[in-house]
Design a protein with these regions (language model features):
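Adenine nucleotide-associated cytosolic modules
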Residues: 1-161
Length: 161
């Protein structure tokens, strides 16, 4: 993103710019940040939605799954018309409609040792929205190796962590 905030950008993010701990400098930092979300399901969907609305300048999304009917009630970026389509394709389209100022990089693949190393280098922060321990351990390993910030969340029935 740009280093300058024009009038339209300032208006868009005015509610967070007025916060003492954000301000213009903080908003520029948000606009210039690069975050990747691994998994755009129950956790990743709302995360990518909010990050795009906050103005994160570059968002990566990685998921190899297709949308099913059972996703619709708990994954807010999807609706019935999206069933059978790849999650990353729909997320990219909907996020661009929400905020056309940001860059979206999509990775329609399963995260594995052979491909993740190349992907991770382009981002400052990794957000774990995955639903399996193998991926969680891999994200932890590479976040340490490349000194990346890793944000982890998990859901189990009615518990969130």
């Amino acid at each position: 993103m740009r280093n300058k905030l024009n009038k339209k950008i300032i208006e868009r993010y005015s509610r967070q710019i007025i916060l003492k701990d954000v301000g213009i400098i903080g908003q520029k930092a948000i606009n210039n940040s690069k975050v990747i979300i691994i998994g755009v399901g129950g956790l990743g969907c709302p995360i990518v939605d909010y990050l795009s609305r906050a103005g994160v300048g570059t968002i990566g999304i990685a998921d190899f799954d297709k949308i099913s009917l059972s996703n619709i009630h708990r994954q807010p970026l999807y609706d019935s018309r999206d069933i059978g389509k790849f999650k990353v394709d729909i997320v990219k389209k909907k996020i661009k409609a929400i905020n056309s100022n940001i860059k979206i990089k999509s990775y329609k693949k399963k995260i594995a040792t052979k491909n993740f190393e190349k992907i991770i280098k382009n981002f400052d922060i990794i957000v774990d929205g995955s639903d399996n321990f193998k991926t969680k351990f891999l994200l932890n390993k590479y976040s340490i190796k490349y000194k990346k910030i890793l944000v982890v969340g998990a859901i189990n029935k009615f518990d969130g962590h």
